[in-house]
Amino acid sequence: MELQKSPHAPGVRPVKIHCRDVGSGLPVVFLHGGWGYRVYPINRQVKAFGDRVHFLIPDRSGYGRSEKLSGQMPADFHQRAAEETLLLLNAMGIERAIFWGHSDGAVIAAMIGLSAPQRCARLILEAFHFSPRKPNSRSFFKQFAVHPDELKEKTQRLLAADHGEKQWRKVVQRNCRVWLKLGAESTRSSDDLYKGRLSKLKVPVTFIHGRGDPRTEPGEIERARKAMAGADMRFIECGRHSPHSEKACWRECNEILGEFFVGK
């Protein structure tokens, strides 16, 4: 698929977007995290629900088989990615869907909910980020912003398979650096990625969150819950950053997803 242009790929025309299109039935758009799709894939969910769910899994520009990008990511990349996603769905003729976002993808899904609620049957926000400040992750971001080759070999293989041997390091570095930038530009501990707008969300929201997520700051999810008092919050006790793909808890994650994917 080619977009005439995308705010997530400034200066590039046209913009090539690769989208996996699997299954049939209820449209569900899965929005991957900041390192791309194949590190945390939804293979088990496709297998479990593919006979009743039409999964659309786009690679954002800069990722996977979509348009290659260079240079630093802008601080408002989540909003830009939300706009790109809607442009893609317009081109595909998808008017309304469940948006399931993981990590950075969950931020993007929430921003779609704010800007285009009529397009959203539900938001499923997994491994959600609320704060731009991540002091407990700063050393993680600093390490891999400079030394991506220090990642585990398995992770490197998955990244290379997704983005290519020449590109995967750049993907990791761009994402780590923009999170460091977000933290540096935040002036108050009360800052959030949504500029105080989450309470204005008018679509059904379900959080899926691993209790042991290392990218979550103390009190961060509680702040998100307070901002969205009516949201459905599901903690997975054994979960870390990607409950849907973790061996210990993907089944529990599927039970939750099945509430929204079965019989719709």
Descriptions of predicted regions:
Residues 177-197:
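Active-site nucleophile elbow and catalytic-triad environment of alpha/beta-hydrolase enzymes
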Residues 15-68:
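Conserved HGGG/HGGXW glycine-rich cap/lid loop of the alpha/beta-hydrolase fold
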Residues 201, 207-209:
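Short beta-strand/loop motif that positions the catalytic acidic residue
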Residues 107-115, 120-152:
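Flexible "cap/lid" loop of the alpha/beta hydrolase fold
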Residues 43, 194, 203, 217-226:
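Short alpha-helix in the alpha/beta-hydrolase fold that links the catalytic acid
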